[in-house]
């Protein structure tokens, strides 16, 4: 009788974890439409359709690719710790009952669904850097290639059993995607925008954000989904997921306040766009360490990530001369690097036994692993993006739109649609 009761209790706990993870998966999915709104509100109205489309189409390519071969390449067994084999192609052999790992609290298929949402949002982040000047067909091909060449190998190296960069490798900590999601996409965005070159009227035109309420709504949806992003990375409903939930909220809140302070110092007034961007920066900063650092450390991470990203946006872009249109690198790349390093400063075995103690506890090894993991991620992202660009040029030809199309706007020239058809004339 006691064995039957124990078995029933275990089944209830497993069912609870499955429900929790499916909800978190749905929350992470919501981040992609949220990103479409966030980016769409930031551009001029002649590029709204194109900008939002560059996020939405990835829902299609991302899911189909993930089911066919993406999950297998990312998480199937491997002998090299770099890329999975094809044993799970088409999700063949992905169990509905057995866990991904021996100790997993959820079935392999549930884990697959959760990770699928990460594979959608990550390449979508890149598109903000090239808004308004890249041909849609070229971006379509580039994103497919980037997922294959950069994302799937990185996901395997950091999160899969035996991965080169993760706990079975050099020991770099990445709870929910500092390396895999934000640094990879942010650095790739930087490389791609440098290759494309600046917009034709860059530094000469006054780029007006066309819809601030849409930006705020998009940022809010991103934060809402981010709770599933970070808390769900605990992979079960337990104290660690609650801890990740709280560090996520605290870092975002602190980052909002510090960005507002930066606005006041520089421009004498706080801005709604600034507060929204600060929210996203704080979320990026806490992502690698959400399940590894104390809650008080999340305050420090949020407070410092905003100024670092703010400096890159306000001074770094001009100093280094790159046109990161919607600050994909400045927020995600810069914030991801900063957050990854601070994870090596504040990580604590008292929070998560998988983590080593950070610099603040007098130990250097974890910080060194974080720095090495970031450097390797940078190399993979840069090299992979250059390869993807070269292949895209071969497949589609010139990837940048003509000056005429850029001036007219990509909504009409690439899609034959207008976000606001009742308005006449061009956006200046």
Regions found by a protein language model. Name each.
Residues 1-9, 13:
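Single conserved hydrophobic/aromatic residue that forms the stacking wall/gate
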């Amino acid at each position: 009788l006691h064995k039957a009761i124990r078995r029933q209790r275990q089944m209830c706990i497993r069912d609870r974890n499955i429900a929790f993870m499916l909800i978190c998966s749905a929350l992470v999915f919501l981040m992609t439409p949220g990103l479409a709104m966030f980016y769409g509100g930031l551009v001029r109205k002649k590029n709204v359709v194109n900008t939002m489309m560059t996020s939405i189409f990835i829902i299609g390519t991302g899911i189909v690719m993930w089911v066919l071969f993406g999950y297998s390449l990312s998480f199937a067994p491997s002998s090299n710790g770099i890329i999975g084999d094809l044993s799970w192609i088409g999700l063949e052999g992905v169990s509905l009952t057995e866990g991904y790992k021996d100790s997993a609290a959820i079935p392999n298929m549930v884990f697959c669904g959760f990770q699928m949402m990460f594979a959608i949002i990550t390449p979508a982040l890149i598109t903000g850097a090239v808004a308004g000047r890249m041909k849609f067909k070229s971006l379509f091909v580039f994103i497919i290639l980037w997922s294959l060449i950069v994302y799937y190998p990185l996901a395997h190296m950091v999160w899969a059993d035996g991965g080169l960069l993760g706990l079975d490798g050099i020991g770099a900590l990445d709870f929910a995607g500092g390396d895999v999601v934000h640094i990879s996409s942010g650095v790739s965005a930087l490389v791609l925008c440098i290759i494309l070159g600046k917009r034709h009227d860059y530094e000469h035109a006054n780029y007006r954000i066309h819809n601030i309420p849409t930006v705020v709504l998009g940022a809010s949806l991103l934060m809402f989904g981010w709770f599933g992003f970070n808390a769900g990375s605990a992979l079960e409903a337990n104290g660690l997921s609650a801890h990740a939930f709280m560090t996520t909220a605290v870092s975002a809140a602190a980052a909002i306040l510090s960005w507002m302070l930066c606005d006041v110092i520089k421009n004498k007034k706080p801005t709604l766009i600034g507060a929204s961007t600060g929210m996203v920066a704080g979320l990026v900063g806490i992502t690698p360490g959400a399940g590894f650092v104390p809650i008080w450390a999340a305050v420090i991470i949020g407070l410092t990530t905003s100024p670092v990203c703010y400096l890159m946006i306000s001074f770094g872009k001009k100093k280094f001369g790159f046109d990161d249109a919607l600050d994909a690198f400045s927020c995600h790349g810069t914030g991801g690097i900063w957050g990854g390093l601070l994870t090596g400063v504040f990580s604590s075995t008292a929070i998560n036994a998988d983590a080593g103690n950070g610099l603040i506890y007098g130990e250097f090894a974890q910080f060194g692993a974080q720095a090495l993991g970031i450097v390797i991620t940078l190399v993979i992202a840069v090299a992979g993006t250059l390869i993807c660009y070269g292949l895209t040029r071969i497949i589609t030809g010139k990837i940048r739109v003509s000056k005429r199309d850029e001036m007219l706007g990509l909504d009409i020239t690439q899609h034959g649609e207008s976000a606001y058809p009742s308005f006449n004339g061009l956006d200046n």
